[in-house]
Amino acid sequence: MSEMTPREIVHELDRHIIGQDKAKRAVAIALRNRWRRMQLPEELRVEVTPKNILMIGPTGVGKTEIARRLAKLANAPFIKVEATKFTEVGYVGKEVETIIRDLTDVAVKMTHQQAMSKVQFRAEELAEDRILDILLPPARDQWGQNEENDTDSSTRQSFRKKLREGKLDDKEIEMDIAAPQMGVEIMAPPGMEDMTNQLQGMFQNLAGNTSKKRKMKIKDAIKAATEEEAAKLVNQEELKEQAIFSVENNGIVFLDEIDKICKRGDSSGPDVSREGVQRDLLPLVEGSTVSTKHGMVKTDHILFVASGAFQMSKPSDLIPELQGRLPIRVELEALTSHDFKRILTEPKASLTEQYKALMATESVNIDFSEDGINKIADAAWQVNERTENIGARRLHTVMERLMEELSFDATDRSDELLIIDEAYVNERLDELVENEDLSRFIL
């Protein structure tokens, strides 16, 4: 779990996301509170519940990007789901409990990788011993016991040194390797994923763990043997317990597009993918126990971060019980022309840097002048104002249109230096930006 301070988290988010300081502060505090809670005594820790967050803001202002970056910083089980993918229990489709099951799968995978990295050094030593036993079979006495003398030991150490230096990598040997488990693909209708997983596990268990002799290069043999030895050193039952503990105490669920499951005033009758989903989410957010293939998972201390544009609805259209379970509200601001300029230049992997790198692969060097960047930002902002406001995503459309000709001709323009300035941008975008009808269909 991440031990970064709120200031460090915000600083890290600033490297990738422009503006939206309120939202960054809210998620930074929420993430730090996860760590603070784990420092409390057991009896008090149980009482401290997470303060779930609702992020409200127009499309393309950074809600989903904050979630993506948070997942990398959290170092905790994290899953991002679209609220629109679920239906009410009893109807065809995915039910909301699959969120927790998927989160548990993520935690098991994370815990497994961490455990494997801890035993990596020991596993490599055991793998080397297996390879050396094949290269230098130990001498046996008359009773079949292994004999070891000083000469054998020094020869073994000499071979071990060569093995580590990679001098034997291309030599071929034959060794026993666990046969890969047969993957059984079962097609099932939506909502039947649990049954599918159980059947797949049953078929894999029937196959059993078999090994077979394979001829391979020593370089590949060491890799395969290391994975096998590491798996033997890891206790799978302990892993599952650690993963469930991690989900229950550090798990984070990001619910995107929550505004799309608000009940609209003009609709009548049951709405199984809207209000029904909200009702099903209530016990998860409030705290309940979900059955997974790894064990029972309590959701009392899982942090939920919901987000939505709320263009066709408003937060008060959510059912009151769900509103109460999302106590922290953060409003994200619409992006201005100045924000667009910063988005094009400040982030670590900004759009301009991406296009420079892509063109450099064709030996075409491009550079963006300051007035060129200003013009691109203005063009994107103007199109947003005149047509639909899709936020920073408009920059992708404008940039792709601007670079289309160069991308097509790049192979014929090797070793050329091209400055993209205001005149270059005007030549390619002016007509589209000024003509509202063209903007609607092309940008």
Swiss-Prot record:
Belongs to the ClpX chaperone family. HslU subfamily. Pfam families: AAA, AAA_2. Keywords: ATP-binding, Chaperone, Cytoplasm, Nucleotide-binding. A double ring-shaped homohexamer of HslV is capped on each side by a ring-shaped HslU homohexamer. The assembly of the HslU/HslV complex is dependent on binding of ATP. HAMAP family: HslU. ATPase subunit of a proteasome-like degradation complex; this subunit has chaperone activity. The binding of ATP and its subsequent hydrolysis by HslU are essential for unfolding of protein substrates subsequently hydrolyzed by HslV. HslU recognizes the N-terminal part of its protein substrates and unfolds these before they are guided to HslV for hydrolysis. GO terms for cellular component: HslUV protease complex. This is ATP-dependent protease ATPase subunit HslU. InterPro entries: AAA+_ATPase, ATP-dep_Clp_protease_ClpX, ATPase_AAA_core, Clp_ATPase_C, HslU, P-loop_NTPase. GO terms for biological process: protein unfolding; proteolysis involved in protein catabolic process. One of its GO terms (molecular function) is proteasome-activating activity. ATP binds at residues 18, 60-65, 256, 321, 393. It is found in: Cytoplasm. It comes from the Bacteria. It comes from Photobacterium profundum (strain SS9). Residues 141-165 are annotated as: Disordered.
